[in-house]
Amino acid sequence: ILSCWKDAVQKGGKDAWKEHALDFLRASNYAGIAFGHAGCAAVHAMAYPLGGVHHIPHGQANQLMFADVMRKYQQKKPVGKINQLEELLAAELGTPPVFALNALYELMDDVLKKAPLREHGVTEDELPVFAKSVIETQQRLLGNNYVELTEEDLLHIYKKAF
């Protein structure tokens, strides 16, 4: 899917993705199968209040949270399985592993520009409520995290995305 998005971005134009539509559908199917077996984690957990309160589509809400969650993972545990992800991304995106996640965030922004949460109607006073809600209601997902995230961590992530 990354190589297809890279190609579509390089070709430009709003219809460039259509050349890879079947690949995107296949990748989405595989992702669904993988999620069913491995589960999801903080990105999805933190997306739920955004969709529930502000009706942000779940996929877009995931995109809004992804980079900041990953940065928090890197901050809390820079050495570990995250390095395997960096190696895989580096090979696909043609960049050194140390820059791989940033290259992914840039590609994601090229596909769909990430807007701050405030531009989706989220207010700053909602952020602590969302963080608390995620801790209280999404332990099934949070249990799959790369590292444990506290309510304070979640609030920090929401604030970064705000």
Predicted segments with their positions:
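Gly/Pro-rich interdomain helix-loop hinge
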Residues: 53-126
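Residue-level detector of well-ordered alpha-helical segments, enriched
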Residues: 20-23, 42, 61-65, 81, ...
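Short alpha-helical scaffolding segments that buttress acidic/His motifs in well-ordered protein cores
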Residues: 24-32, 46, 66, 104, ...
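Short acidic (Asp/Glu) and glycine-rich catalytic loops that position anionic groups and cofactors
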Residues: 1-2, 43-47, 82-86, 108-113, ...
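Short, amphipathic C-terminal "tail helix"
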Residues: 126-162
